[in-house]
Amino acid sequence: MPVNPELQGRVLPAAAPYLVGREKVREFARAVGATHPVHLDPEAARAAGHADVVAPSTFPVVLQAMTVTQLLAEPDTGIDYSRVVHGEQAFTYTRPVVAGDELTATLTVTKVATLGGNAMVTAESAMVDGSGAHVVTAVSTLVVRGDDA
């Protein structure tokens, strides 16, 4: 079954709020080699003007993965997860993510295209804090390999 082109423009319900934990930020920072003290030490983060440790710039993939999982669970996508590879990732920030943030993400499928027999699905996950203020938007492109790939 090919990827459903009518996915383009679909907005999924907001994912459950995600509480950014200090230890989760530290674990992620260590995993990606982000050694700056603001990622690991609350005092260093406070000295730099932040309320708590600052998540590395790619940390929002944790929450975005939850929204993409919602998309893949939709019965009419035509996306065979066994044929999916990650194509591209980008982030647009309003402010840094810090421990203690409670973020809610809403996914919008912004583009469905075919290139070289493969489907390309681009999705934006807009993340807001508990007050509803925008924090970051994560944009990713999933490549769904075609039958000949």
Swiss-Prot record:
Stored InterPro entries: FAS1-like_DH_region, HadA-like, HotDog_dom_sf, UPF0336/Enoyl-CoA_hydratase
Q: Which domain of life is it from?
A: Bacteria
A single MF term (Gene Ontology): (3R)-hydroxyacyl-[acyl-carrier-protein] dehydratase activity
Residue ranges constituting the MaoC-like domain according to the UniProt record: 16-117
Enumerate the CDD domains for this protein: R_hydratase_like
- By its UniProt entry, which Pfam families does this protein fall under? FAS1_DH_region
Under Gene3D superfamilies, the record lists: Hotdog Thioesterase
Provide a GO biological process annotation. fatty acid biosynthetic process
Q: Which family does it belong to?
A: Belongs to the UPF0336 family.
The entry's protein name is UPF0336 protein CMM_2793
